[in-house]
Amino acid sequence: MVQIGFIGAGKVGTLLGRYFRSKSFEVVGYYSHRMEDSQQSAILTDSRAFSEAASLVAACEWVFLTVGDDGLSEVWQRIRPHLRVGQVIFHCSGAKSLAVFTNVPAGVETCSLHPLLAIDSGNQSLDAIKQAAFTVELAMPDSLILKQLSGLGNPLAVIEGAQKIRYHAACVFFSNLVIGLVENGTTLFEACGLPKDFTATAWQPLFLTNARNLVENGPQAALTGPVERNDLSTVTDHLEALPNDQVALYGVLSRFLLQIAQQKHPEIDYSDMERILQNEENGYDTAKAETTRK
């Protein structure tokens, strides 16, 4: 059984360690610059807390660098002199490629393993990560690592290093930017004079029902609203009512919805809707919008 260690005892390293252990991989332990963090992660994985990174490296076959993106190169340079033939060094960054591993010693393999999952705690339930997909970047196309990782039972896909940053941007659209959209919506609710205690939760059934429909049935089936219905006056009124800094955001996202609507309803002529949204892209009449709001 492969012996696994983690340099970095934060939420990602801790959750992965717990998950690997639940799948009968041998987790040897953790090293972190804060011994308390190493000890806490070791407790959660029934493993060891190491006081030196070199000692952890010596005890493991697979070493995961579960540190922030900006710290990867520094940690790599620290452990590189201690590596030996047959070891595999992983990072878990969605944005960084294997290029961060410079001057790889002969006989050492490198790999990245990125879970498509929002991890908020190392102690969170394993239910979500059991369903999560992972992307893998391999230094060696014929590597046996992919076969070994398939033992986790998760969906796996190989990604080229040159595509990592665009891939990570896509992940941000699926996760982080959604939070920004929700914040934007609640701000608009409050601007309408709705009470804060109402706006804090009123959007949740709408959001969750829509998200569930999207996941279960796909974008075309889930799409509703004025763009799909080709409600020209409603979309125009939206653009006039929104603050200037939100008009562009509404327009960009609506053009994506328009593409889906056109695929869903090829019998509908959306040319006027396209014109309205195209006009917004080329500079919506914000002076008119200001007059309307007054």
Where on the chain are the PLM-derived regions?
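NAD(P)+-binding Rossmann beta1-loop-alpha1 motif at the extreme N-terminus of oxidoreductases
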Residues: 1-55
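Interdomain hinge/lid region at the active-site interface
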Residues: 212-269
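NAD(P)-dependent dehydrogenase/reductase Rossmann-like domain
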Residues: 260-261, 265-294
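Short, polar loop motifs at secondary-structure junctions
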Residues: 33-37, 94-97, 139-142
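Internal alpha-helical scaffold of NAD(P)-dependent oxidoreductase catalytic cores
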Residues: 26, 40-44, 103, 109, ...
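Rossmann-like NAD(P)(H) cofactor-binding subdomain of soluble oxidoreductases
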Residues: 45-124
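Short, hydrophobic beta-strand segments that form beta-sheet elements in well-ordered domains
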Residues: 28-32, 89-92, 134-137
